[in-house]
Swiss-Prot record:
GO molecular function, one term: pyridoxal phosphate binding
Biological process, per Gene Ontology: glycine biosynthetic process from serine; tetrahydrofolate interconversion
Location(s), subcellular: Cytoplasm
UniProt function note: Catalyzes the reversible interconversion of serine and glycine with tetrahydrofolate (THF) serving as the one-carbon carrier. This reaction serves as the major source of one-carbon groups required for the biosynthesis of purines, thymidylate, methionine, and other important biomolecules. Also exhibits THF-independent aldolase activity toward beta-hydroxyamino acids, producing glycine and aldehydes, via a retro-aldol mechanism.
Organism lineage: Bacteria, Pseudomonadati, Pseudomonadota, Gammaproteobacteria, Enterobacterales
The protein, known as: Serine hydroxymethyltransferase
Top-level taxon of the source organism: Bacteria
Length: 417
């Protein structure tokens, strides 16, 4: 009988200590990493349930193991909610991550050596959009498009490259782009080469679900996403499609299982189902609207303080700060801000002369701070604290004073009550 009589803190004190410290860090730090968010207690509870014990290779009604009648119900719930949330005809909720979702889609639609066209990592793309260190850059012939001098996607370049190289697939989406993607125009360009148009909406899935950011589902052949970030669910992946056919959907399913993965993580799929239900509620839309409001306020504040924002604006949850004229690297900014309990991430900027380990910029996102209740007043203060620290990096007393203010704000707005 599995009845743990010894308290966890006594059974494994080292692990317990690390977890407790991480809990405190999340409560006492202002989280501005654009890819991070806080899940609900429901999501965390489900992930710690008995579902973690169940193996369920295959799909609902077509499993390779017995005893799947209840996990079938759970996966079907997740599928139907995902389809409703994003107005899709097809959903696969099994990918363990966004990268796994992308890998599955690529292998379903492409052959090794095919040409793909994705956004440059240094211009705001993602590793899986063709980076040389990633499977996408190793398996396929990669051509990259980027942003223009104004920090906007260069559609003329995209069209020119499409006509010249005739890619089998064009990848839309980003990890560090603050503009609005013109999915319709990108599909038009893809059609010029009879190419698949795949959109990775991982960063803006929550905004899309709330109707605040354009939904790519009517333009892309296939859409992929993570289920955390702005969607605020568990860490996982998702594949969606609309107006496809059974042949496409079967290819996608087979590419996920058995192509890329074995048994699905049923405890995570259940958590996805809960997250999709939460995202269908009216208050989720209010939350997403506030994310963008906060992001815009921060951009305005940084501009007022003389900081350069790539593209000069934001229409989503994130933006990039170019620190070139501030004589500080992204890495150093990351380090000094962390001493004041403000967490950001160093990030390359378009045409960055520094390595990805150093960078000339930082990326800031507002999904997590908005989740804990911060509004315009709070994020405006945070912007001022950041500029105060970066303008005076050697003033350690200033860092300590701001850290006190950060702790006061975090105490006023706890993540988990």
């Amino acid at each position: 009988m599995l009845n743990n009589k010894i308290d966890f803190s006594k059974y494994d004190p080292k692990l317990w200590f690390a977890i407790e410290q991480e809990k405190k860090r999340q409560e006492n730090h202002i989280e501005l990493i654009a890819s991070e968010n806080y899940t609900s207690n429901y999501v965390m509870d489900v992930q710690g349930s008995q579902l973690t014990n169940k193996y369920a290779e295959g799909y609902p009604g077509k499993r390779y193991y017995g005893g799947c009648e209840y996990v079938d119900i759970i996966e079907e719930l997740a599928i139907e909610r995902a389809k409703k949330l994003f107005n899709a005809d097809y959903a696969n909720v099994q990918p363990h991550s966004g990268s796994q979702a992308n890998f599955s889609v690529y292998t379903a639609l492409l052959n090794p050596g095919d040409t793909i066209l994705g956004m440059k990592l240094s211009h705001g793309g993602h590793l899986t959009h063709g980076s040389s260190v990633n499977f996408s850059g190793k398996m396929y012939n990669v051509i990259s498009y980027g942003v223009d001098e104004n920090g906007e996607i260069n559609y003329e370049e995209l069209l020119r490259l499409t006509k010249k190289y005739k890619p089998k697939m064009i990848i839309g989406g980003f990890s560090a782009y603050s503009g609005i993607c013109n999915w319709k125009k990108m599909r038009f360009i893809a059609d010029k080469a009879d190419a698949y148009f795949v959109v990775d909406m991982a960063h803006v899935a929550g905004l899309v679900a709330a109707g605040i950011y354009p939904n790519p589902i009517n333009y892309a052949h296939v859409v992929t996403s993570t289920t955390h970030k702005t969607l605020a669910g568990p860490r996982g992946g998702l594949i969606l499609a609309k107006n496809g056919d059974d042949i496409l959907y079967k290819k996608l399913n087979l590419s996920v299982f058995p192509g890329a993965q074995g048994g699905p993580l049923m405890h995570v799929i259940a958590a996805k189902a809960i997250a999709f239900k939460e995202a269908l509620e009216p208050k989720f839309k209010t939350y997403q609207k506030q994310i963008v409001k906060n992001s815009k306020v921060m951009v305005e504040r940084f501009l007022e303080k003389g900081y350069k924002i790539i593209s000069g604006h934001t229409f989503n949850h994130l933006f990039l700060i170019d620190l070139t004229n501030k004589k500080i690297t992204g890495k150093d900014a990351d380090i000094i801000l962390s001493k004041a309990n403000i967490t950001v991430n160093k990030n390359t900027i378009p045409n960055d002369l520094k390595s990805p380990f150093i960078t000339s910029g930082i990326r800031i996102g507002t999904a997590a701070v908005t989740r804990r209740g911060f509004k315009e007043n709070e994020v405006s203060k945070i912007s001022d604290w950041i500029t105060s620290i970066l303008n005076n990096v050697d003033d350690h007393n200033n860092v300590l004073q701001i850290k006190k203010k950060v702790l006061e704000m975090c105490l006023k707005y706890p993540v988990y009550i």
